[in-house]
Amino acid sequence: MGAEIRSGHRSRHWQARITKYQSFKGTKREAQIELVRLMDAVRRGDYIDPSKVTVAEFLDRWEKDWAANNVSPKTRERFAQLITHQVQPHLGNMLIQKLRAVHLSELYGRLLSNGRVGGGALSAKTVGHVHRCLRRAFGHAAQWGLIAQNPAALVHPPRVRQTEIEILRQNEVEAMLASLRSRNALLFTIAIVALGSGLRRGELCALRWSNIDLESRTLRVEQSIEQTRAGLRFKAPKTKHGLRSMTLPPSVISELRAHWRAQNEQRLALGLGRGSPDDLVFPAWDHQPLMPNTLSREWSRAVAAIGGRRISLHALRHTHASSLIAAGVDILTVSRRLGHASPTITLGVYGPPLREH
């Protein structure tokens, strides 16, 4: 078993080589590190000949070794589901060095027609998630010298049609709030805040009183709750745009003051003492964090009891954004308030429906 580090002709890249000629391209320092890793793998008996690695073996190792340390638990969980249910049954036994772009193109076609577990078509959006997962994974396979190039980079995912978003009319908002006020005080206040701020479900669940200044009427988004099989996790926004401050309407502040008083009365009645700034604004009944999935279930039940069309919780965010744009608020301000990475995203979501209205 031989090994060497060398610089290629007319190239500033260095290569670490180990028989059978596995190559890694990068700086000299990176090549030295990779060579040490390869030699350690050989000594431990963990070295796998790249020519014998199947797609399933690589993706399993990539998910456990790379994804586990470089993406959020929720994203890793999603990657594992897509790999297990949508990729491995079709391509798992193929040698990764035999994989070509045409195989991925055929895979996407099969998933669109019958890609669901148990049968049925997958949506173009979900197939797009599969594509992004594979593009990232096979990009690393190419970087690590297992394949010559990333086949997913040569394939276009299926086009996702623009879906119609839910925007509530004023009479629908009024009817919904009137019913919630008498039926469920917590959901009523959540609806008021969502309609006045555009916060996402996870951001509402993670909101603390320390994030709200009732005197200056400001709210600061600092965290979100992520729900995985392992439990709940408070996490910072994915990008700097998600970390944001906004001014709330006086009507929202008024309801939050009433909610603060009611929450403290409940705590005192239970012998828990007065609340603190670190308390959650919208906790569960036992004053533990409210799970996002639980909130969605409770919301669906409450809306179903009202009657009329089913209104999703996320529709309140859409309604908030569309009302701002309709009132003449510039798109950059709306985008920042929603925590979008760019105004282009905001226009892509809300431009078409506003033209129709």
Give a label for each model feature.
Residues 1-52, 239:
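Short, surface-exposed polybasic/aromatic micro-patch for ligand or macromolecular engagement
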Residues 27, 159, 225-227, 338-357:
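Catalytic-site neighborhood detector that most strongly recognizes the C-terminal catalytic loop/helix
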Residues 34, 49-142, 154-157, 172-173, ...:
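Short, Lys/Arg-enriched alpha-helical recognition elements, typified by the DNA-recognition helix
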Residues 42, 112, 142, 194-195:
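Alpha-helix C-terminal capping/helix-coil junction sites
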Residues 116-120, 174-188, 197, 246, ...:
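Short, basic (Lys/Arg/His-rich) helix/loop patches that form interaction surfaces
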Residues 120-132, 143-209, 215, 226, ...:
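Basic, Lys/Arg- and aromatic-enriched nucleic-acid-binding interface segment
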Residues 223-241:
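Short, flexible, glycine-rich and Lys/Arg-enriched loop motifs at helix boundaries
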